[in-house]
């Protein structure tokens, strides 16, 4: 029997399709299977899977990025059943992706123009995940070298090491691919229209992801990615394209806002405030230098969060996007 030829095998959920899961196997040796008639190259094998009802009974949801065990494998039809889910090492809510090791925030230098408020919202959402955050500036070819250097210096002041890329000229793509090759699962996020999908098409030429134009009236991109799917960048490294949103949510916890700003978090390590519940406005004993660029944004976000807290105790959950 086909199921008897293969034991339970480990894999990662790389896509969801209606009621099915697409699982990429970690290891696969086709030469050991009498019934195998497919390719024997080194490409990872993907199986279309259903899930055991016992997972539902245990309340074990299965999402993209989950490491799972598949069984009852039909090699000829490339189908199987997900029997178990491994504990997650990390989790982001929106979109739901498990075991992320890095978040890549993509922001355009132009078309649409760079917006510090919007950029900060995406960066705060990325910082909440607790994994490495990489900042990428797209459409580098639309501004001069001097303008780019000013933007890079500015973002270094925010506490990041930004990289600039252009899908038109190819500049920076090699360096970005090298950076991503050292992380197991990187999620791309950012406003729609900044070129995330175009960037992935350049990094992964075998893909043909649909690219949308930027809206002329709003100067915002039209969403082209409708679901989350993982793509293999190189051996041991996957990347995800995610649906774009123009206004991600702020974190729900007022007291965690400050540490999500790297330039403010660094100040608190060196010059802690007198009181633990300091919000770094006009409180006595505050050790924060308020001359940093994003301080007005921090105060604005804090006021917005306070209004939301007053209007709805508990608020809505925070997520990546």
UniProtKB/Swiss-Prot annotation:
Its gene name is: rsgA
- What is the uppermost EC class here? hydrolase
Task: Report the cofactor remark.
Answer: Binds 1 zinc ion per subunit.
Q: Which organism is it from?
A: Prochlorococcus marinus (strain MIT 9313)
Q: What is this protein's function per UniProt? A: One of several proteins that assist in the late maturation steps of the functional core of the 30S ribosomal subunit. Helps release RbfA from mature subunits. May play a role in the assembly of ribosomal proteins into the subunit. Circularly permuted GTPase that catalyzes slow GTP hydrolysis, GTPase activity is stimulated by the 30S ribosomal subunit.
Cofactor list: Zn(2+)
One GO CC term on file = cytoplasm
Q: Which residues form a coiled coil?
A: none
Oligomeric form and interacting partners? Monomer. Associates with 30S ribosomal subunit, binds 16S rRNA.
This protein is called Small ribosomal subunit biogenesis GTPase RsgA
């Amino acid at each position: 029997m086909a199921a008897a030829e293969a034991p339970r095998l480990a894999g990662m959920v790389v896509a969801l399709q209606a009621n099915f899961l697409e699982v990429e196997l970690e290891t696969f040796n086709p030469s050991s299977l009498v019934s195998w008639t497919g390719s024997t190259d080194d490409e990872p094998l993907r199986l279309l899977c259903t899930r055991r009802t016992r997972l539902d009974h245990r309340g074990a949801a299965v999402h993209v990025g989950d490491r799972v065990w598949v069984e009852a494998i039909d090699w000829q039809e490339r189908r199987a059943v997900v029997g178990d889910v491994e504990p997650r090492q990390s989790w982001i809510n929106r979109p739901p992706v498990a075991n992320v090791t890095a978040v890549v925030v993509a922001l355009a230098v132009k078309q649409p123009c760079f917006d510090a408020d919007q950029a900060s919202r995406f960066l705060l959402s990325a910082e909440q995940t607790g994994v490495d955050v990489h900042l990428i500036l797209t459409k580098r070819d639309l501004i001069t070298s001097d303008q780019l250097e000013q933007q890079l210096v500015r973002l270094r002041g925010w506490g990041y090491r930004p990289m600039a890329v252009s899908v038109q000229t190819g500049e920076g793509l090699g360096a970005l691919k090298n950076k991503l090759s050292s992380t197991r699962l990187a999620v791309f996020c950012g406003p729609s229209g900044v070129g995330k999908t175009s960037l992935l098409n350049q990094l992964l030429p075998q893909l043909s992801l649909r690219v949308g134009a930027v809206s002329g009236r709003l100067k915002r991109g039209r969403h082209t990615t409708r679901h989350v799917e993982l793509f293999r960048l190189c051996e041991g490294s996957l990347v995800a394209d995610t649906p774009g949103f123009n206004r991600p949510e702020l974190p729900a916890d007022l007291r965690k806002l400050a540490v999500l700003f790297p330039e403010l978090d660094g100040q608190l390590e060196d010059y802690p405030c007198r009181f633990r519940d300091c919000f770094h406005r006009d409180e006595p004993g505050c050790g924060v230098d308020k001359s940093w660029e994003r301080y007005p944004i921090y105060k604005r976000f804090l006021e917005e969060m306070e209004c939301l807290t007053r209007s709805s105790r508990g608020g809505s959950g925070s997520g990546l996007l």
